[in-house]
């Protein structure tokens, strides 16, 4: 996890360096993910004013892992509304991220080495299904908070 966080810092440094060439201050992987996943956050019930922040957390959970996303959430929790905190917390509670494919291949692939290709192919579908399940739970939680 420590090496992974260091790799994220390296990628953020490179993205920030390239962003400075084009006059974009504070460009990072998290900010890019925020804009990509902002519509998803808005669809699941996050107020639009906080959608980029929530989208960044959801993107971090999918692309990086849930530990990094929860760490980021704890740093900015005081700036978010209670509804957004609840929705984001539910959307981050899951193991559906890209690094999970490697864990699946390593764990299950050891029991069936000839099926590693199939496991890798199904891993992407498992990430999508797991993410949709988390987002559905987050949507229901957000809906129940408005009642």
Question: Each predicted region: which residue ranges?
Answer:
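Transmembrane helical segments that form the transport core of multi-pass membrane transport proteins
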Residues: 1-77
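C-terminal transmembrane helix pair
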Residues: 61-147
């Amino acid at each position: 996890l420590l090496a992974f966080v260091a790799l994220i810092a390296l990628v953020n440094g490179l993205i920030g360096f390239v962003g400075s060439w084009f006059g974009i201050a504070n460009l990072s992987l998290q900010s890019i993910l925020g804009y990509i996943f902002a519509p998803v956050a808005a669809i699941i019930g996050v107020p639009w004013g906080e959608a980029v922040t929530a989208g960044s957390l959801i993107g971090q959970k999918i692309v990086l892992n849930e530990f990094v996303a929860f760490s980021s959430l704890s740093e900015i929790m005081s700036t978010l509304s209670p509804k957004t905190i609840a929705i984001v917390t539910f959307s981050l509670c899951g193991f559906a991220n890209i690094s999970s494919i490697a864990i699946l291949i390593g764990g299950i692939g050891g029991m069936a080495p000839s099926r590693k290709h199939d496991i890798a192919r199904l891993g992407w579908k498992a990430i999508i299904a797991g993410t949709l399940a988390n987002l559905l739970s987050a949507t229901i939680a957000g809906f129940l908070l408005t009642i």
